[in-house]
Every structure is written in C-alpha cells, then in structure tokens.
Amino acid sequence: MSLEDDVKAIIVDQLGVSPEDVKVDSSFIEDLNADSLDLTELIMTLEEKFAFEISEDDAEQLRTVGDVIKYIQERQN
C-alpha cells in the first residue's frame, strides 16, 4: 500500500467514515465531522504507525487528509 492508502485506511478506521468520503482535500472537521477527541486519537495512531512524534503545534496545522500525507512524507525524507 502507498502512504496515501495507509493514511486513508487509518482515517477510515479512526473516524468511522466511508472510504469514498476520504479524499486528499477532505477537511477533518468540515467534511469528515471529526471533533477534537477524534483528531487527538488520530494523531496518536499516526504517531504509532509511522514511529515519530507530531508536536501539538504541527498537529494544529493538519487540517486535511492531504496535509497529513504531506507532513508524513516530509518527516520520512
């Protein structure tokens, strides 16, 4: 699976949304109806999966699925 597929699968699992609803430009709050607890749990799962810590400041900037994918790509390089 690609990074994008991995991230989308985690989002589907964590937020309980349909895979068809998870697009690169989907906003966690507006499009996927996530609340702050959902986002905290999502960040924790991403940290565990990709084995690095996401600072609170960075987490606040991750507003869309694409933001998360780009952030992880940058951290992995």
UniProtKB/Swiss-Prot annotation:
Q: Which residues form the Carrier domain?
A: 1-76
| The keyword Secreted is assigned to this record | no
Q: Which GO terms describe its molecular function?
A: acyl binding; acyl carrier activity
- Could you name the Gene Ontology cellular component terms for this entry? cytosol; membrane
* Posttranslational mods: 4'-phosphopantetheine is transferred from CoA to a specific serine of apo-ACP by AcpS. This modification is essential for activity because fatty acids are bound in thioester linkage to the sulfhydryl of the prosthetic group.
Its UniProt pathway annotation is:
Lipid metabolism; fatty acid biosynthesis
Biological processes, Gene Ontology terms: lipid A biosynthetic process
One Pfam assignment: PP-binding
Instruction: Give compartment(s).
Output: Cytoplasm
- The keyword Lipid biosynthesis appears for this protein: yes
Keyword annotations from UniProtKB, A to Z: Cytoplasm, Fatty acid biosynthesis, Fatty acid metabolism, Lipid biosynthesis, Lipid metabolism, Phosphopantetheine, Phosphoprotein
- Report the coiled-coil segments: none
Q: Which family does it belong to?
A: Belongs to the acyl carrier protein (ACP) family.
Tell me, in a sentence or two, what this protein's role is.
Answer: Carrier of the growing fatty acid chain in fatty acid biosynthesis.
Identification of the protein by name: Acyl carrier protein
Q: Which organism is it from?
A: Chlamydia trachomatis serovar D (strain ATCC VR-885 / DSM 19411 / UW-3/Cx)
Name of the coding gene: acpP
